[in-house]
């Protein structure tokens, strides 16, 4: 007969390869697959590998013009998920050649771009990625990283303190600057634009940048400490975003900010390169992440979004609190906190880490804990996150009964007390309340803060459990 072997073949005949030995250069992915009834797991896993690499639904003539063996994704392992009847973890290996160098955008378009709407699957979740060293090396990564940031700020041996300025929408630039000044003057290291403060009618971006810079220079002069305010450069176009970043640099401020998921990885990587070239730190907010990562069976985990951010570039990223008002299961959160900060992270399924990841000295990212936290959480936060973190109290600073500056004082006193106690060998988990109470005896600001928030709890079970 003429022609080639046309027709529809099972994916597993080509894309399920249980004997495949993964290469050091492969990008490896772990997917949580929930097939439709009647679809065998091998076929579902192979379908994921095919549709996210070289495959399509039928054999095509042009397959003969290339080497599938060289370019195809391969499903090389399938394991059942404990306690879930029809759910599997499918491991897929992708050859490095499938990806454009230095493009997080292309990596995600390839791996998660198309396959999540696939009919043979009820649901699909990307649990983890192993980024090979060869691919990591094509990325600049964070603009500066943890060590350089500490050197720039001259702050060592403790977590950094921040505060999001509230009410997040509606303040004029002048009043916004007043709020920034009071917080920094009271003892915080940073204040922050909210993620949705961009350039609205009540406060245009340029006025805000000028007011905040004035506030931080005044606070810096009075305290002798280096201060920062995260100026949110996120905008409707990349050109506008860069214009804002350039103006921030002209003001001489130390740090700008970007919403990396709503702004997109392409814009984020552009900004990160500019920040490294011009000595600006880059704070990253993860607005929209829960749309993608909160469902247990579908979407992708935050650890994947966090890896993508470390490659694209950012010096800080919000990462949940474990104790406040927003999602964050302790082991899972600590798993991706290590993926952000450390150079080498061992596979550890108990923390949701499916692969050993070597970052080959790509700079680390400081995790930012924020959302419903206050002074009474300080011992737990210091214990959980350690020194390399930013603890951000929005309402937990500005909600102080005496105002912003006393709120900032209370937080700084609580933090210094916890760090000192830890350095003296005390157990923060057990003696935390006692440590805060002792400090409150000589700090009226802290005593007042403890009084206001002594009863507040955000007690709900976490959604994302292993």
Curated annotation (Swiss-Prot):
Positions contributing to Mg(2+) binding: 192, 194-195
Where on the chain is N6,N6,N6-trimethyllysine found, per UniProt? 5
Q: Which InterPro entries match?
A: RuBisCO (IPR033966), RuBisCo_large_chain_AS (IPR020878), RuBisCO_lsu_C (IPR000685), RuBisCO_lsu_C_sf (IPR036376), RuBisCO_lsu_fd_N (IPR017443), RuBisCO_lsu_N_sf (IPR036422), RuBisCO_lsuI (IPR020888)
The cofactors it requires, by name, are:
Mg(2+)
Q: Where is the active site?
A: 166, 285
Which compartments does it reside in? Answer: Plastid, Chloroplast
Q: How is the cofactor bound?
A: Binds 1 Mg(2+) ion per subunit.
Q: Which Gene Ontology terms describe the biological processes this protein takes part in? A: photorespiration; reductive pentose-phosphate cycle
Its function, per the record, reads: RuBisCO catalyzes two reactions: the carboxylation of D-ribulose 1,5-bisphosphate, the primary event in carbon dioxide fixation, as well as the oxidative fragmentation of the pentose substrate in the photorespiration process. Both reactions occur simultaneously and in competition at the same active site.
What HAMAP family does this protein's entry cite? RuBisCO_L_type1
So what family is this one in?
Answer: Belongs to the RuBisCO large chain family. Type I subfamily.
- This protein is called what? Ribulose bisphosphate carboxylase large chain
Q: Which organism is it from?
A: Hedera helix
| Chain's gene name | rbcL
């Amino acid at each position: 007969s003429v022609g080639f072997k046309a027709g529809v073949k099972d994916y597993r005949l080509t894309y399920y390869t249980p004997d495949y030995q993964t290469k050091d250069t492969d990008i490896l992915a772990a997917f949580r697959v929930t097939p439709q009834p009647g679809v065998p797991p091998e076929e579902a896993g192979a379908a994921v590998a095919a549709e996210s690499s070289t495959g399509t639904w039928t054999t095509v003539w042009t397959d003969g013009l290339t080497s599938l063996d060289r370019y195809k994704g391969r499903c090389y392992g399938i394991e059942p998920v404990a306690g879930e009847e029809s759910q599997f973890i499918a491991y897929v290996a992708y050859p490095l050649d499938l990806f454009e160098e230095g493009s997080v955008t292309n990596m995600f378009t390839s791996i998660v771009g198309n396959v999540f709407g696939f009919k043979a699957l009820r649901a699909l979740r990307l649990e983890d990625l192993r980024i090979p060293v060869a691919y990591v090396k094509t990325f600049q990564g964070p603009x500066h990283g943890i060590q350089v940031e500490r050197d720039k700020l001259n702050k060592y041996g403790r977590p950094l303190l921040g505060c999001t300025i509230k009410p997040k929408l509606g303040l004029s630039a002048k009043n916004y600057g007043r709020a920034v000044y009071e917080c920094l003057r009271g003892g915080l290291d940073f204040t922050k634009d909210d993620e949705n403060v961009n350039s609205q009618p009540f406060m245009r971006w340029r006025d805000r940048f000028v007011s905040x810079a004035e506030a931080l220079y005044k606070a810096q002069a009075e305290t002798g400490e280096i201060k920062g305010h995260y100026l949110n450069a996120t905008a409707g176009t990349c050109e506008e975003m860069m214009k804002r970043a350039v103006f921030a640099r002209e003001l001489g401020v130390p740090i700008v900010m970007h919403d990396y998921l709503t702004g997109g990885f392409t814009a984020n990587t552009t900004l990160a390169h500019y920040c490294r070239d011009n000595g600006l730190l880059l704070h990253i907010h993860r607005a929209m992440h829960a749309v993608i990562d909160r469902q247990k069976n579908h979407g992708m985990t935050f650890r994947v979004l966090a890896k993508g951010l470390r490659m694209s570039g950012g010096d800080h990223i919000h990462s949940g609190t474990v104790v406040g008002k927003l999602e964050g299961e302790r082991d899972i959160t600590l798993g991706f906190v290590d993926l952000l900060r450390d150079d080498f992270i061992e596979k550890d399924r108990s923390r949701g880490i499916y692969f050993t990841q070597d970052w080959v000295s790509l700079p680390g990212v400081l995790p930012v804990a924020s959302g419903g936290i206050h002074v009474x959480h300080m011992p737990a936060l210091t214990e959980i996150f350690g020194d390399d973190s930013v603890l951000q109290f929005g309402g937990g600073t500005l909600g102080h009964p005496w105002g912003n500056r006393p709120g900032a004082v209370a937080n700084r006193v609580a933090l210094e007390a916890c760090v000192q106690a830890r350095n003296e060998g005390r157990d923060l988990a057990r003696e935390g309340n006692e440590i805060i109470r002792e400090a409150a005896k000589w700090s009226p600001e802290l005593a007042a803060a403890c009084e206001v928030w002594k009863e507040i709890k955000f007690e709900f079970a976490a959604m994302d459990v292993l």
